[in-house]
Structures are given as C-alpha cells and as structure tokens.
C-alpha cells in the first residue's frame, strides 16, 4: 500500500514537473507549421517536385497502372503513353 502511494505521488510529481518546465509547445508548433507552409509556397523548395521517371518506350518492369517508374504512370513492360 505504501509503495503504491509513493509511486502515485512520484508519477504526479514528475508529470507536474514536466508541465512546469516544458516550453510553450503550442506556439512552437504554430511556428513550425508556418515555416513549412512558407517552404511549400516556393515550389522549388520541395525536392519531391523532381521526379526521376522513365520516358516512353523505356523498360519499366512488371505491367501495372500508376507505375511511378514511368512519367506517364502506365507500364506494359515498357512505358506507354496515356490514352486520351
């Protein structure tokens, strides 16, 4: 019983200590999201915009739709153009 009470008091103390000594995390997250949004407005800031894809007629592997290896995302052992 005494050990349980001591554990509860210790957990409460450590929880309170964490909240008292923590930085203002809400404003820190807001700043982080604002910075991320500013970077995304500049399209050249994102390395995801540069795709390394294969041109039409190049080997792409197993045939399936939405193949990220092909710029057209259509693979039939070779990259094929999208149908209109």
Swiss-Prot record:
MF terms in GO: calcium channel regulator activity; ion channel inhibitor activity; toxin activity
Disulfide bonds: 53-71, 60-75, 70-79
Keywords: Calcium channel impairing toxin, Disulfide bond, Ion channel impairing toxin, Knottin, Neurotoxin, Presynaptic neurotoxin, Secreted, Signal, Toxin, Voltage-gated calcium channel impairing toxin
GO cellular component: extracellular region; host cell presynaptic membrane
Signal peptide: 1-22
Family of this protein: Belongs to the conotoxin O1 superfamily.
Domain remark in the UniProt entry: The presence of a 'disulfide through disulfide knot' structurally defines this protein as a knottin.
Protein name: Omega-conotoxin-like ArMKLT1-02
Organism: Conus arenatus
């Amino acid at each position: 019983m005494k050990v349980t009470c001591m554990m509860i008091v210790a957990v409460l103390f450590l929880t309170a200590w964490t909240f008292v000594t923590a930085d203002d995390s809400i404003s820190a997250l807001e700043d982080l999201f604002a910075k991320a949004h500013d970077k995304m407005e500049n399209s050249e800031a994102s390395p995801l915009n540069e795709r390394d894809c294969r041109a039409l007629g190049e080997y792409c592997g197993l045939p399936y739709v939405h193949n990220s290896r092909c710029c057209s995302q259509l693979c039939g052992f070779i990259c094929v153009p999208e149908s209109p």
